[in-house]
Amino acid sequence: MKNPFVIKAYESRELFCDRNDELQLMLRNCINHTDMTLISQRRIGKTGLILRLFDEIATVHPDIHTIYVDIFSSRNIDDFIKLLAEAIMKAFKPKTTLGEKLMAFIKTMRPQLTFDNITGEPQLMIAYQSPHEKEYTLRGLLDFLDSQSIHIIIAIDEFQQIRDYPEANMEALLRTYIQQTRNLTFIYCGSNKHLMADIFTNEKKPFYSSTAFVSLGKISTESYATFIRRLFNECGREIDDDSIAFILDWTRRHTYYTQQLCHTIFANGDLQTDISKVKTACEQLMQQGEAVYLQYRQMLTIKQWNYLIAVAKEGSVSQITAAQFLGRHKIGSASTSQRLADALCEKGLLNDDINVKGVTYSVNDVFLSHWLERL
């Protein structure tokens, strides 16, 4: 029996939990040609929501076409163009009218076209004579799509990667080309919320105030509990209410970790799940991650490691400069605490959640947090 608790981005709407409000908001934005920036902490389900949105669009608005491109692996404008072109080719199959037009256009770039041995997906290699030719190719791709007189949604995942490109003008270049299109709608998302926020909220940057923001929080306890119970029951298995409550509390309703724990519980094969079975799965997950967690210890200073433990033992900390927190964990001064928190946020080990009451810090990896609590 296939495990219904998906730990990759998206499989089907039946195996996707809630997000109905966010889905409808994004759908309205797409229909009305409103570009969006999706902001949330890591592993909360941004990519899954985008793919769920595309699934919905294919059903209710089949005249709208969708393209998804993940640029996490990109290092420069060359890689960006390559990944975008490959994503476009994947979206528009060669035997369709638009696909044939696309292939004719791609050939004008004089590419070396190969196919992945495993997936069969097209892979491009494009040789450029000058930086100007790269810019011309990027603009040409967007102009080609825009000229088809059909509505196309382009989702760019890990968009903050453009900040690491050696081409200092990449943001300005993209913004200039994108704002001239009429039939393209863009969705930007990324796992580094600080860089994403700076790209879109810094008034000195090209993308400032160019999109609507969609904030992705945690799924409600009620929705997730109903979802978990349904998937177990549909597969002929039982799970009691106390077990579900423990799962949601232990994973802090963080999408990736909730899915991972439920996936592990289901994989263990018990027809009836109680809290003891849930705790067994929790132990398995922490043991599986232990080798990685010990590597973190090697890459951090002693003070940083001890600070990470302190935050884990607290669960979350909203006043990292408070005397009580500093004294309880022998951290030192308030400035030391802030410096350590900033360093660990920069390394991606701490999450700083900004809310109306201030900033709350927690360990990014929920399983790591529970493992650290024991030290």
PLM segments and residue spans:
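Conserved Walker B catalytic segment
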Residues: 35, 124-192, 201
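Short regulatory helix/loop adjacent to the ATP-binding pocket of P-loop NTPases
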Residues: 193-211
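Alpha-helical DNA-recognition elements
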Residues: 56, 173, 264, 343-347
